[in-house]
């Protein structure tokens, strides 16, 4: 009997101890989302691969959302890890996965149907949804004018939600939601007449309209709306609270305004300005820097007129120019490139030309040996503009299309595809403004042709005297087609 009682007492003590252990274990709190991020040392973010959010150019990762979320990661003292989603449904779904990203920064607008999936942050950018049509076609002036039109929008977007609401009022309204396109694709399709209308936010139109001369705003569809970041609905509020504090601070300290100005507040004044203006600048600007072009061209063994043409395309031979993306100087060098090339002052025209010459030849020497002149020069120019990685992506696409990846004539057909989702999703480096390097190379070739022609000994005096005839303006004076090598 005593043994039985002692056994029961030991069992009771064991059960009590076990219960206390389990109870204490239950009282130990799991780390919050914010604590997990800091412990891991990585902020995992999912976004869209597009000009207004995130993409890679010759200078590395860039985009409005990328820069803003990089500031947030820096504030947390952690590394930023970017993932991209092919479409909005994939983006929202990824947030709900245990091993997925903890934050979506993708130009999102609060959506009622998404509120079971995510919690939205404080706003950081105000945008207006706009109906886009092709210039020369009938312009719809209101919602009723959308009926009978071929309309396409991003699948799962707030624009699709708007059209769904309008369809209740106008049952005949038809539209297509696509997860195979991005905003750039939609604008291109309107520009080329493949679809009648699309809906985009005002910030994305502002960034891309220069590349699509036929697109116009028909009307604003509703009031302005706010873009926000998002976290999974099932997560605690620790990270969301930190995000809101950061965004509020960025609004007050000018960080947001600086990013808005960089990406949306400027008109790109560089580029082709006409042969007459170029002729004026030959006489007024080039003489100040010609000796530097010649000096460093000799060092790097490149035609000085090609270097001068690059300089004109980049800055119109203005040594103090600064672009919206932070590249500076006559040759428009990034800070990183300048440091790598030994340039301490990008606004010093001599140093800028030296760095630009060195950088161009470095790119050219790194190209595949199978690329021969004159294509090698055009490839190097394209890489100078868009980055070597994207150039290789275009060459890969050329191979798949059974074109010659070593010929500029073929590769330049592929570069614009890097701005189209159906193509860039197949590439290593993703989205790029692929049309830009095509125009970049074409402009430089024209400037080079003119420089080659006017620097013939018998014509150099005409430049100094202002009696210059420019090829393309005066048809009786064809440009010399000498190679730039």
Swiss-Prot record:
UniProt cross-references to SUPFAM superfamilies, sorted A to Z:
Lysozyme-like, Periplasmic binding protein-like II
Protein name per its UniProtKB record: Membrane-bound lytic murein transglycosylase F
- Name the top EC class: lyase
Q: What biological-process GO terms show up in the record?
A: cell wall macromolecule catabolic process; cell wall organization; peptidoglycan catabolic process
Q: What is its EC number?
A: 4.2.2.n1
**Entry GO terms, CC:** cell outer membrane
Q: Do you know which Pfam families this protein is assigned to? A: SBP_bac_3 (PF00497), SLT (PF01464)
GO MF, one example: peptidoglycan lytic transglycosylase activity
On whether RNA-binding is a keyword of this UniProt record, the answer is: no
Q: Which InterPro entries match?
A: Lysozyme-like_dom_sf, MltF, Solute-binding_3/MltF_N, Transglyc_AS, Transglycosylase_SLT_dom_1
The protein's topology relative to the membrane is:
Peripheral membrane protein
Keywords carried by this UniProt record? Cell outer membrane, Cell wall biogenesis/degradation, Lyase, Membrane, Signal
Q: What is known of its domains?
A: The N-terminal domain does not have lytic activity and probably modulates enzymatic activity. The C-terminal domain is the catalytic active domain.
Job of this protein = Murein-degrading enzyme that degrades murein glycan strands and insoluble, high-molecular weight murein sacculi, with the concomitant formation of a 1,6-anhydromuramoyl product. Lytic transglycosylases (LTs) play an integral role in the metabolism of the peptidoglycan (PG) sacculus. Their lytic action creates space within the PG sacculus to allow for its expansion as well as for the insertion of various structures such as secretion systems and flagella.
